[in-house]
């Protein structure tokens, strides 16, 4: 507690200095110096009591103890009153013993003179009045214990412990609880970091085990593939006689089959030696290598003879030109056997064989043939290739959980998390507003249905219990999510009834409101406008600044070259800058201190759908009707830093098709992209869920990092809350479903 008090004093002192309350600061310093409670430091309180005894200041000692009783001890229950009385008695006895030990009998007599009225009726003091008159009180059996060092130390320790327990148990103001909360927060963060490291370690271990298992499977498959028939695996060390003997012992059916030779069925024709072709061979498709021909002819001849060793030897007793020629031929055959065996183990043999058998088959038709005739080696090669492609860098995020909020029954227009990251406000096309929390459990806090159509939604920044709701009839409502009622409703403009966008300043003092005239076409029109054509929002509009407290209009911004509908607005972190995206494709940057447009530039061919500041606020990102995601440098008007093309399901208009030709089209209303806390990753919409891209690569292209998925209808708006330790991604779709995905950032 003492540390918390000391730190709070420093914070209060810093705050007073920041506010310029110098007189109050001087008064605070003076009172801290004269603080009798010593900042709730037990050691200093005990030291103060001992110092008063050492200077024989009995009056100050009595006053200080009375102050402690009045300020601290009075808060205790009555059961502790005997303990307090015993400590007070021991304190005065400690003072008396000290006066006798220092030969100040006059101070001892003074003590009894001043305290006689209070002590004479107390039984525990009856024997102590003679203490100043005893020649050797330290040897007296009644007082000897109190003159020992052990008793003095025991008293000091008892007093110290009593005060310590008292300070720990006494109620403290709310401002002092922050220290304990900070410690708990730090402890939780440390535990989270330990668990995070354990999680990553387990993932790495799982990845390693899977890799080892895959390698073992590959090795096992390779061993199975390389295990050749005995008569093939022993070719390199067989002599001619043994080869003839083996061939003669094989069944005659093998020699008569079109797939007569094991080598012949796998080796490509291009690999065979023309000099070893037998003139008595059959059709070209049945030809094999010269050695294979020898096997077949010898086996056919052996069919009419009696099998045995003699027959085998007689087959080799044919005419030979000479001993040297026979040796040379034998060596050539052995070399060819080794060559054929090596070719057998290559993966290209089966593919060439398949191409040889069906040369007329097209590429699309040849693929089934390849799959039919390929051996385990080719399959293994494909698996290995797929495995190597799968060895990508570790994902930047780990999906901890994905929950669904399903209390909407029509397409979502807006879905926003409040500043604290604890609650979500969602709005659908039927005018249903839901305010719900997701931590620790998903629970609806407030629900409301608007009679008039709603087009925009924004959380108030300072009082995060309030919602700003813009309608399609020219009004803005202030809704209290805790009281579950409308606090006020203001008319913006009757001529421009559509409130397309709302943005509340971070300081909470004001908000901007974009009002536009009725659209040129209906939202329910099934045909999306062509890129670059005159869009549905190419109508006049106004950008207004309103005071949040008084709910009165402060000013109207100038929109050059002509008033146009503003689709999207966003403030920077301190509210000094406002960026807007309009239906004419122009981005305008407003100086909120001067209340004027600082710069503007043509950004998109068509409407600007969504615009946001970068995390460092040196750039602005935008998504437009032309399906482009562009980064702009705000220090140089119109300077394009990077540009990327997005799929149509990320930019809209969003289309949901149904049975019998039913088609629902929704133009973008809410945020189309959101950033993580560091601005390195971006969440966008897609047809099946949110997509996370990596920003800021050297090639200045978007890199698809993670697909959140989970949706059956197109996602129309997203949000990314980083208020908690884990990031929370919100993706809302046209079927009324909102997916809440909790991500854990992988810290490298």
From Swiss-Prot:
<feature type="modified residue" description="Phosphoserine">
    <location>
        <position position="257"/>
    </location>
</feature>
<feature type="repeat" description="WD 2">
    <location>
        <begin position="449"/>
        <end position="489"/>
    </location>
</feature>
<keyword id="KW-0677">Repeat</keyword>
<keyword id="KW-0472">Membrane</keyword>
<dbReference type="InterPro" id="IPR039724">
    <property type="entry name" value="WDR91"/>
</dbReference>
<comment type="function">
    <text>Functions as a negative regulator of the PI3 kinase/PI3K activity associated with endosomal membranes via BECN1, a core subunit of the PI3K complex. By modifying the phosphatidylinositol 3-phosphate/PtdInsP3 content of endosomal membranes may regulate endosome fusion, recycling, sorting and early to late endosome transport. It is for instance, required for the delivery of cargos like BST2/tetherin from early to late endosome and thereby participates indirectly to their degradation by the lysosome. May play a role in meiosis.</text>
</comment>
<dbReference type="GO" id="GO:0005829">
    <property type="term" value="C:cytosol"/>
</dbReference>
<feature type="repeat" description="WD 7">
    <location>
        <begin position="710"/>
        <end position="748"/>
    </location>
</feature>
<feature type="modified residue" description="Phosphoserine">
    <location>
        <position position="294"/>
    </location>
</feature>
<feature type="coiled-coil region">
    <location>
        <begin position="183"/>
        <end position="228"/>
    </location>
</feature>
<feature type="region of interest" description="Disordered">
    <location>
        <begin position="266"/>
        <end position="368"/>
    </location>
</feature>
<dbReference type="InterPro" id="IPR036322">
    <property type="entry name" value="WD40_repeat_dom_sf"/>
</dbReference>
<dbReference type="GO" id="GO:0051898">
    <property type="term" value="P:negative regulation of phosphatidylinositol 3-kinase/protein kinase B signal transduction"/>
</dbReference>
<keyword id="KW-0853">WD repeat</keyword>
<feature type="repeat" description="WD 3">
    <location>
        <begin position="512"/>
        <end position="556"/>
    </location>
</feature>
<feature type="repeat" description="WD 4">
    <location>
        <begin position="561"/>
        <end position="600"/>
    </location>
</feature>
<comment type="similarity">
    <text>Belongs to the WD repeat WDR91 family.</text>
</comment>
<feature type="repeat" description="WD 5">
    <location>
        <begin position="603"/>
        <end position="642"/>
    </location>
</feature>
<comment type="subunit">
    <text>Interacts with WDR81; involved in early to late endosome cargo transport. Interacts with BECN1; negatively regulates the PI3 kinase/PI3K activity associated with endosomal membranes.</text>
</comment>
<protein>
    <recommendedName>
        <fullName>WD repeat-containing protein 91</fullName>
    </recommendedName>
</protein>
<feature type="compositionally biased region" description="Polar residues">
    <location>
        <begin position="284"/>
        <end position="300"/>
    </location>
</feature>
<feature type="compositionally biased region" description="Basic and acidic residues">
    <location>
        <begin position="333"/>
        <end position="344"/>
    </location>
</feature>
<keyword id="KW-0967">Endosome</keyword>
<dbReference type="InterPro" id="IPR015943">
    <property type="entry name" value="WD40/YVTN_repeat-like_dom_sf"/>
</dbReference>
<feature type="compositionally biased region" description="Polar residues">
    <location>
        <begin position="345"/>
        <end position="354"/>
    </location>
</feature>
<feature type="compositionally biased region" description="Low complexity">
    <location>
        <begin position="266"/>
        <end position="279"/>
    </location>
</feature>
<dbReference type="GO" id="GO:0045022">
    <property type="term" value="P:early endosome to late endosome transport"/>
</dbReference>
<keyword id="KW-0175">Coiled coil</keyword>
<dbReference type="GO" id="GO:0042176">
    <property type="term" value="P:regulation of protein catabolic process"/>
</dbReference>
<dbReference type="GO" id="GO:0010008">
    <property type="term" value="C:endosome membrane"/>
</dbReference>
<feature type="modified residue" description="Phosphoserine">
    <location>
        <position position="289"/>
    </location>
</feature>
<dbReference type="Pfam" id="PF23138">
    <property type="entry name" value="CTLH_Armc9"/>
</dbReference>
<dbReference type="GO" id="GO:0031902">
    <property type="term" value="C:late endosome membrane"/>
</dbReference>
<keyword id="KW-0597">Phosphoprotein</keyword>
<feature type="repeat" description="WD 1">
    <location>
        <begin position="407"/>
        <end position="446"/>
    </location>
</feature>
<dbReference type="InterPro" id="IPR001680">
    <property type="entry name" value="WD40_rpt"/>
</dbReference>
<dbReference type="InterPro" id="IPR056327">
    <property type="entry name" value="ARMC9_CTLH-like_dom"/>
</dbReference>
<dbReference type="Pfam" id="PF00400">
    <property type="entry name" value="WD40"/>
</dbReference>
<dbReference type="GO" id="GO:0141039">
    <property type="term" value="F:phosphatidylinositol 3-kinase inhibitor activity"/>
</dbReference>
<feature type="repeat" description="WD 6">
    <location>
        <begin position="665"/>
        <end position="703"/>
    </location>
</feature>
<dbReference type="GO" id="GO:0031901">
    <property type="term" value="C:early endosome membrane"/>
</dbReference>
């Amino acid at each position: 507690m003492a540390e918390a008090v000391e730190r709070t004093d420093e914070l209060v002192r810093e705050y007073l200095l920041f506010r310029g309350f110098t007189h109050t600061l001087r008064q605070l310093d003076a009172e801290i110096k004269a603080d009798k409670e010593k900042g709730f430091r037990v050691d200093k309180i005990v030291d103060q009591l001992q110092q008063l005894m050492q200077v024989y200041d009995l009056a100050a000692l009595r006053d200080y103890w009375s102050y402690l009783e009045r300020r601290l001890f009075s808060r205790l229950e009555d059961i502790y009153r005997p303990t307090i009385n015993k400590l007070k008695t021991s304190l005065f006895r400690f003072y008396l013993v000290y006066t006798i030990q220092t030969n100040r009998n006059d101070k001892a007599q003074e003590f009894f003179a001043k305290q006689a009225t209070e002590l004479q009726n107390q039984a525990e003091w009856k024997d102590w009045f003679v203490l100043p008159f005893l020649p050797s009180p330290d040897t007296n059996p009644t007082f000897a214990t109190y003159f020992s060092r052990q008793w003095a130390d025991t008293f000091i320790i008892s007093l110290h412990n009593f005060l310590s327990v008292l300070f720990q148990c006494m109620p403290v103001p709310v401002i002092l609880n922050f220290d304990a909360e900070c410690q708990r927060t730090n402890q939780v963060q440390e535990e989270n970091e330990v668990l995070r490291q354990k999680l990553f370690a387990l993932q790495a271990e799982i990845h390693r085990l899977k890799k080892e298992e895959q390698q073992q499977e590959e090795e096992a498959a390779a061993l199975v593939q390389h295990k050749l028939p005995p008569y093939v695996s022993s070719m390199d060390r067989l002599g001619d006689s043994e080869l003839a003997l083996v061939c003669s012992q094989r069944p005659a059916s093998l020699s008569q089959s079109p797939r007569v030779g094991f080598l012949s069925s796998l080796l490509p024709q291009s690999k065979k030696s023309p000099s070893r072709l037998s003139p008595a061979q059959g059709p070209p498709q049945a030809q094999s290598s010269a050695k294979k021909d020898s096997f077949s002819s010898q086996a056919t001849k052996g069919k009419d003879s009696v099998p045995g060793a003699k027959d085998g030897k007689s087959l080799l007793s044919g005419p030979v030109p000479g001993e040297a020629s026979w040796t040379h031929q034998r060596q050539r055959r052995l070399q060819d056997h080794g060559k054929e065996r090596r070719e057998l183990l290559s993966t290209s043999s089966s593919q060439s064989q398949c191409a040889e058998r069906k040369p007329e088959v097209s590429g699309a038709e040849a693929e089934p043939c390849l799959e039919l005739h390929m051996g385990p080696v080719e399959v293994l090669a494909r698996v290995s290739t797929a495995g190597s492609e799968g060895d990508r860098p570790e994902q930047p995020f780990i999906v901890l959980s994905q929950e669904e909020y399903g209390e909407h029954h029509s397409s979502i227009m807006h879905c926003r998390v409040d500043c604290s990251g604890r609650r979500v406000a969602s709005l659908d096309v039927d005018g249903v507003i839901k305010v719900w929390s997701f931590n620790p459990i998903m629970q609806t806090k407030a629900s409301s249905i608007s009679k008039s159509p709603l087009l925009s939604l924004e959380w108030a920044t300072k009082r995060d219990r309030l919602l700003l709701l813009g309608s399609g009839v020219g009004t803005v409502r202030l809704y209290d999510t805790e009281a579950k009622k409308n606090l006020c409703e203001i008319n913006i403009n009757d001529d421009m009834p559509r409130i397309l966008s709302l943005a509340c300043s971070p300081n909470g003092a004001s908000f901007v409101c974009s009002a536009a005239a009725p659209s040129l076409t209906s939202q329910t029109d099934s045909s999306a406008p062509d890129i670059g054509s005159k869009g549905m929002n190419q109508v006049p509009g106004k950008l207004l600044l309103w005071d949040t407290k008084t709910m009165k209009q402060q000013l109207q911004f100038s929109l050059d070259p002509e008033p146009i509908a503003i689709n999207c607005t966003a403030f920077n972190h301190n509210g000094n800058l406002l960026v807007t995206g309009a239906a004419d494709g122009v981005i305008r940057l407003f100086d909120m201190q001067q209340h004027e447009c600082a710069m503007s530039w043509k950004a998109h061919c068509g409407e600007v759908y969504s615009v946001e500041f970068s995390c460092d606020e040196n750039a602005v990102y935008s998504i437009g009707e032309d399906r482009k995601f562009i980064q702009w440098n705000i220090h140089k008007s119109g300077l394009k830093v990077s540009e990327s093309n997005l799929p149509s399901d990320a930019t809209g208009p969003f289309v949901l098709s149904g049975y019998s030709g039913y088609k629902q089209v929704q133009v973008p209303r809410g945020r189309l992209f959101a950033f993580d806390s560091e601005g390195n990753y971006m969440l966008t919409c897609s047809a099946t869920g949110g997509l996370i891209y990596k920003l800021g690569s050297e090639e200045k292209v978007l890199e698809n990092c993670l697909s959140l998925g989970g949706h059956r209808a197109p996602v129309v708006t997203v949000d990314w809350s980083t208020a908690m330790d884990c990031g929370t991604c919100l993706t809302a779709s046209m079927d009324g479903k909102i997916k809440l995905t909790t991500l854990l950032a992988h810290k490298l």
